[in-house]
Regions:
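Conserved AMP-binding A3 loop
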Residues: 27-29, 153-181
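Structural core segment of the AMP-binding/adenylate-forming
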Residues: 44-45, 72-133
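Conserved pre-ATP/AMP-binding loop-to-beta segment of ANL
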Residues: 140-157, 164, 195-204
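A short helix-loop-beta submotif of the ANL/AMP-binding
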Residues: 52, 58-78, 82-86, 94-100, ...
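Conserved AMP-binding/adenylation subdomain of ANL enzymes
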Residues: 176-204, 212-253, 267
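Adenylate-forming
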Residues: 58, 103-110, 209, 237-238, ...
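ANL superfamily adenylate-forming
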Residues: 107-149, 164, 176, 267-268
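Conserved AMP-binding/adenylate-forming core of the ANL superfamily
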Residues: 2, 17-60, 64-68, 85-90
Length: 286
């Protein structure tokens, strides 16, 4: 299960710089401890393995912690497209039968009337629960109950380009296999072609894809746990910001869609940046 993976990563890799967002850093074990607190919070709220718990936020540290806690608790994580509004968002919440929703303040204006318990990232306007309330739930270990490897770990929604979005069910085993597959591919390229893609000191990847997308979730975020790689969060895509972050944070890996690669290559000042830290650039999709 995902919980097993998170624990094995801690045993194999120990502690390492894991999440960086706007100058704030969290180590892997620190992040996992916050995830354990969040899992304990879910248990106190009556969330059981197999229940659906949603996340509707822009990329942020709390998004990562929420996913780790939900997955390790054995609940089904439902990453909702944070660009949705109105009826589209209501459809996702109702169709997935959410028991609880983690949301940021910007999205809360569209979700506050929905019939689901909500936790807000920051909260200056209401009496709703916040992440501060979540992290006050101290849990030294994961809750006793857990999922099985064939239970649904994450429910990702399609874009709905030909109709209503469809929920794609990924089991714990399928997600773990995907992570191990990507990691093994990187190792094999090192053995066969002499290319170093993952096993480098101070590896850092730019999180420039929304976490509600499979690329951001699995090939950037979750692969980084096994690869002992720091995730440098972009809250919103901007080519100038990306070039600055690659240079200043010494990013080693970046993935994305072809339009992002085009943005970087055709930036009017791309030659002014030191991008020598990059060892791997990937792009796919539309």
């Amino acid at each position: 299960t995902m919980r097993d993976l998170f624990d094995v990563v801690g045993l194999l890799n120990g502690d390492f710089p894991f999440v960086h967002e706007n100058g704030s850093e969290h180590s892997y074990l620190e992040t996992i401890q916050k995830a354990k607190n969040l899992a304990g919070f879910l248990a106190k709220k009556g969330i059981k393995p197999g229940d659906s718990v949603g996340i509707c936020m822009q990329n942020c540290t709390e998004w990562i912690i929420a996913y780790l806690g939900i997955a390790a608790h054995g609940a089904t994580c439902v990453p909702l497209n944070s660009w949705l509004r109105g009826d589209e968002l209501r459809y996702g919440v109702e169709h997935s039968e959410l028991k609880l929703l983690f949301v940021d303040e910007k999205r809360y204006q569209y979700t506050q009337d929905l019939d689901v318990l909500q936790v807000i990232k920051t909260n200056s306007t209401t009496d709703a629960l916040t992440f501060d309330d979540v992290f006050k739930t101290e849990s030294a270990n994961w809750p006793e109950e857990n999922a099985t490897d064939e239970d649904v770990s994450v429910l990702l929604y399609t874009s709905g380009s030909t109709g209503l979005p469809k929920g794609v069910m990924l089991t714990h085993l399928s997600v773990v296999n995907a992570i191990l597959g990507f990691y093994t591919l990187g190792e094999l390229r090192g053995l066969v072609k002499g290319e170093t893609l993952l096993a480098v000191d101070n590896a850092k990847t730019l999180l420039n894809i929304p976490l509600f997308h499979v690329t951001g979730l699995i090939t950037i975020f979750l692969l980084s746990t096994l690869a002992k790689r720091q995730i440098v969060i972009m809250n919103k895509w901007d080519a100038s910001d990306a070039l600055n972050m690659i240079q200043n944070m010494k990013i080693t890996n970046i993935s994305g869609v072809p339009t992002q690669s085009w943005d970087l290559l055709n930036h009017p000042k791309v030659d002014d940046f030191d991008l020598s830290s990059l060892i791997d650039i990937g792009a796919g999709g539309a």
